[in-house]
Swiss-Prot record:
Pfam families: Actin
Subcellular location: Nucleus
SMART domains, A to Z: ACTIN
Quaternary structure, from the entry: Component of the NuA4 histone acetyltransferase complex, of the INO80 chromatin remodeling complex, and of the SWR1 chromatin remodeling complex.
Gene Ontology CC: NuA4 histone acetyltransferase complex; SWI/SNF complex
Gene for this chain: arp4
Taxonomic lineage of the native organism: Eukaryota, Fungi, Dikarya, Ascomycota, Pezizomycotina
Any one of the GO BP annotations: DNA repair
Species for this entry: Emericella nidulans (strain FGSC A4 / ATCC 38163 / CBS 112.46 / NRRL 194 / M139)
Cited InterPro entries: Actin (IPR004000), ATPase_NBD (IPR043129)
Domain of life of the organism encoding this protein: Eukaryota
Family (UniProt): Belongs to the actin family. ARP4 subfamily.
Protein name from the UniProt record: Actin-related protein 4
MF terms (GO), sorted A to Z: chromatin binding
Keywords attached to this entry: Activator, Chromatin regulator, DNA damage, DNA repair, Nucleus, Transcription, Transcription regulation
Role, per record: Chromatin interaction component of the NuA4 histone acetyltransferase complex which is involved in transcriptional activation of selected genes principally by acetylation of nucleosomal histone H4 and H2A. The NuA4 complex is also involved in DNA repair. Is required for NuA4 complex integrity. Component of the SWR1 complex which mediates the ATP-dependent exchange of histone H2A for the H2A variant HZT1 leading to transcriptional regulation of selected genes by chromatin remodeling. Component of the INO80 complex which remodels chromatin by shifting nucleosomes and is involved in DNA repair.
Length: 472
């Protein structure tokens, strides 16, 4: 299929076309073929940069985490608000996500047949000899996801990369909220998405985002990690320092609460990776901690409030069995009421664990999940509200915290005692983590979707602004 001649509409309908679905997030980027259940390619949205023999080299994929190279620094092309900040890196990283697992490398592919290390000077900046080099998506229509507040400039830049750099014959840009509601089998829903860098609440009606109701705040999974760090600083019997695996050569088992007995590796300054590498590796331990230990207080009242029988909730929490966790250096401890504290501020801003060193400012009440939902519903027509409350879709990897949906249900029933509140949150972890991707996979494989694609011909005629008219 030649990239300059768009296929006929029939070739877009359903299975004849191997459309690719690309769902970039702050923590991971998901890519796969339309019609499949889960994305084949899941790569970190982080890249590594280091110098070798005087040349700058780049690393993508899981290799970023594996080897602590000298002066290796780690970056992320996405901003915390979900909008791309570094377009050059975003383009390379997205291209890696589908060429490494899905399409294979084409002759002009800058990733040199999937090998990670690139020499900056060798990357084709102009696409010289476009006719002789096949572009990476010359045979595949591309559906991409975006946040609901993505600005026009970013949307236009995305279609330019897809059409001009990758040579896709057809393109569509879909909003995350709409895709997540399709994945849940709903045309209308209130989508609560707890991602790594932010929380968003998106009202969707008949497959369209109700823009006035869209709300988002920076209290995502990375904010919870910062709350865990703040907790560790004030921990008793001793403050906890996270030492990533690459700095430990051996460890000895110790009793709970006893100082660790480990032998540490040291790197001379010229061989040591950058601080950004260490903090990314610490984040992996924090993610494990969130998965194994952290729990959301089930409610119905806040953790700081008295419970239904007059006993303070914190006392109730203390009486529940704790959860043990072992750190990479062998230090281990059982966590009691503290495991509830680190997420309580998603629902109650006053419960924030303050940390002067945190990159996150203390949240305001308006940034908490109940208030975001309230603001989202206040932004839409009164008649739609009961229908949206009966179709609340919970998605995003950070929504997998133990007890999260129970607490959300309690909060919503208190805010809206009249209408029926129904929460749809798939128990299957991959459905919850990849729901935008799954929605895109469903959408791009529908036969009726073929009239929605923007063809290369239309892009050439109307320019990048066509994305604003066609992808509402």
């Amino acid at each position: 299929m030649n990239a300059s001649v768009p296929p006929s509409a029939a070739e877009y309908g359903g299975d004849e076309v191997s459309a690719i679905v690309l769902d970039p997030g702050f923590s991971t980027t998901r890519a796969g073929f339309a019609g499949e259940d889960t994305p084949k390619s899941l790569v970190p949205t982080y890249y590594g940069k280091y110098s070798f023999e005087g040349q700058e080299k780049l690393i993508f994929g899981d290799d970023v985490f594996v080897t602590p190279r000298p002066s290796l620094s780690v970056g992320n092309p996405m901003g915390r608000d979900g909008v791309v900040e570094d377009w050059d890196m975003a383009e390379k990283l997205w291209e890696y996500s589908f060429t490494s697992r899905l399409t294979g490398a084409k002759p002009s592919n800058p990733l040199h047949n999937g090998l990670n290390d690139l020499v900056e000077g060798e990357l084709p900046t102009e696409m010289e000899g476009v006719e002789t080099n096949e572009k990476p998506l010359a045979d595949s229509p591309l559906l991409m996801s975006e946040c609901s507040w993505n600005p026009t400039k970013a949307r236009e830049k995305t279609i330019e990369i897809a059409m001009e750099k990758w040579g896709t014959p057809a393109f569509y840009l879909a909003r995350n909220g709409v895709l997540a509601s399709f994945a849940a089998g709903k045309a209308s829903a209130l989508v609560v998405d707890i991602g790594a860098s932010n929380i968003s609440v998106t009202p969707v009606h008949d497959g369209m985002v109700l823009k006035r109701g869209v709300q988002h705040s920076p209290l995502g999974g990375d904010y919870i990690s910062s709350q865990i760090r703040a907790l560790f600083k004030t921990n008793t019997p001793q403050p906890i320092t996270i030492t990533p695996h690459y700095l430990i050569s051996s460890k000895t088992a110790v009793e709970a609460g006893q100082p660790p007995q480990a032998k540490y590796k040291t790197f001379p300054p010229e061989k040591a990776p950058d601080a950004s590498y260490r903090s990314l590796l610490e984040e992996r331990t924090l993610t494990e901690f969130k998965e194994c230990v952290v729990q959301v207080w089930p409610g119905p009242t806040k953790l700081s409030a008295p419970g239904p029988n007059g006993v303070p909730n914190e006392e109730m929490a203390r009486s529940t069995p704790g959860r043990p966790f072992e750190f990479p250096d062998g230090y281990n401890q059982v966590f009691g009421v503290d495991r509830y504290r680190v997420v309580e501020s998603l629902f109650d801003a006053k419960a924030t664990i303050l940390d002067p060193d945190s990159q996150f400012p203390a949240p305001t009440p308006a940034q908490t999940i109940p208030e975001l939902i309230k603001a989202a519903l206040n932004g839409v027509d009164v008649d739609l509200r009961p229908h949206l409350l009966a179709n609340v879709v919970v998605t995003g990897a950070s929504s997998l915290l133990y007890g999260f949906t129970d607490r959300l249900n309690q909060e919503l029933m208190q805010l809206y005692p009249g209408p029926r509140v129904r929460i749809s949150a798939p128990g299957n972890t991959s459905e919850r983590r990849f729901s935008s991707w799954i929605g895109g996979s469903i959408l791009a494989s529908l036969g009726t979707f073929h009239q929605m694609w923007i063809s290369k011909k239309e892009f050439d005629e109307h320019g990048p602004n066509i994305v604003e008219k066609r992808c509402k």
